[in-house]
UniProtKB/Swiss-Prot annotation:
The gene is ureF. Gene3D superfamilies: Urease accessory protein UreF. Belongs to the UreF family. Required for maturation of urease via the functional incorporation of the urease nickel metallocenter. This is Urease accessory protein UreF. GO terms for cellular component: cytoplasm. GO terms for molecular function: nickel cation binding. Transmembrane segments: none annotated. The keyword DNA damage does not apply. Keywords: Chaperone, Cytoplasm, Nickel insertion. It comes from Enterobacter sp. (strain 638). Its main location: cytoplasm.
Length: 224
């Protein structure tokens, strides 16, 4: 019974219907398409694999693991440090605003689901959804590994759905891309899990340029 409950909670957290605005940001993809860098589903796949290998595996995933451990130990000082580190790794104002907006939306959910959440943690959640997700995973007794898979799938699905609108490509291609990118994520998960503190950080200059240029793009579907 308890395991079933945990699995259902995990499905809820990975659901595309979770009201945190994940489908309102393109993370630079919209400008990359406008610039002609991405014109096919194959080019989209290469772009997303680069983002996964050079950013998600180097920043998001290893920092999530550190945040989860901090929440396990009720260590708000460490959680504050890693949340600040995460924001520092977001290379543009648009990416930082996305992080904070999603964090604020997720904080509202946590306050509704867990009204007895300690007040000192709420400002951290509002800075990053990753911190709130880690705390909620500990509270709901969902393992870090399962939550990491959920985060990866949500990230992949959001990116592919943005690609459907922007590149564009059809739903059949989208489902194939989700499978292929999920396989790539599963293959790289363990290495990302073992990254040391001195291996944290991303170098994705094209993504940063695309995100920065998106602000002045003449016509946009996604937020900036």
């Amino acid at each position: 019974m308890e395991h079933n409950r945990q699995q259902l909670r995990l499905m809820q957290l990975s659901s595309s219907s979770l009201p945190v605005g994940s489908f309102t940001w393109s993370q630079g993809l919209e400008w990359a398409v406008e610039a002609g860098w991405i014109t096919t589903d194959a080019e989209f796949k290469r772009w997303q694999i680069q983002q996964m290998e050079q950013s998600f595996f180097c920043v998001d995933l290893p920092l999530f693991i550190r945040l989860y451990r901090a929440c396990e130990q009720n260590d708000a000082v460490s959680a504050r440090r890693w949340t600040a580190y995460l924001l520092a790794c977001r290379e543009t104002r648009e990416l930082r605003e996305e992080e904070r907006n999603r964090g604020a939306a997720f904080t509202r959910l946590i306050k509704s689901w867990e009204p007895d959440c300690p007040q000192e943690w709420l400002p951290l959640f509002s800075q990053s959804q990753l911190c709130g997700m880690a705390w909620l995973g500990v509270r709901w007794e969902i393992s870090a590994h399962e939550l990491a898979l959920s985060l990866g799938y949500s990230w992949i699905e959001s990116a592919v759905m943005a690609g459907v609108k922007l590149v564009p490509f059809g739903q059949q291609a989208a489902q194939r891309l989700i499978i292929e990118l999920s396989d790539h994520f599963a293959a790289g998960l363990e290495h990302a899990w073992r990254r040391g503190d001195d291996e944290l950080g991303a170098a994705t200059p094209l993504s940063a340029i695309a995100s920065a240029r998106h602000e002045t793009q003449y016509s946009r579907l996604f937020r900036s």
